Amino acid sequence: MTNDTVNVRYLVDDVAAAVEFYTTHLGFSVLSSAPPAFADVARGRLRLLLSGPASSAGRAMTDGTRPCPGGWNRIHLITDDLDAEIKRLQAEGVPFRNDVVIGPGGSQVLLQDPSGNLVELFQPANH
C-alpha cells in the first residue's frame, strides 16, 4: 500500500445528485466530476469514488449480475455533537434510516444518500 488515503467506492444511481449530497451535507470536496459515469469526493483522508451505472464499476459481472447501490456497508463519520448534526441534517431534508442507537462505545445513527447508500454518524461515549 502506497498512501494514507482510504478509498471507498459507492455505486450510485445519479452521480451529480451524489456529489451534491456529499458536498452540501457532509463537507466533502470535489476532486473530479464526470457525470453520468463517475466523480470522486474527499473529506480528510477519505476519498469516495461515486460510480454511476455508466461507469466501469457498474458493468455486469460475468454471470450477468449488475452491481447496484445500497446494502449495509457504510462509511463512518465521527462527530462531537450527534444531536446537533441530526438537527442540521433533518432541517436540510436528509433522510435517516433509523433512530439513534446508544451502545457502550457511543451513539450512532444511519442516514442515506440519494441512492440509498448508508452513512453512519457516530459520537464516541466520552464526548
Model-flagged regions — what are they?
Residues M1-N7, S29-I78, I86-Q112, Q123-H127:
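Vicinal oxygen chelate
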Residues A18, Y22-H25, L89, G116:
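Conserved active-site tyrosine of GNAT-family acetyltransferases
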Residues L118-L121:
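Short glycine-/small-residue motifs
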Residues L11:
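Catalytic core of Fe(II)/2-oxoglutarate
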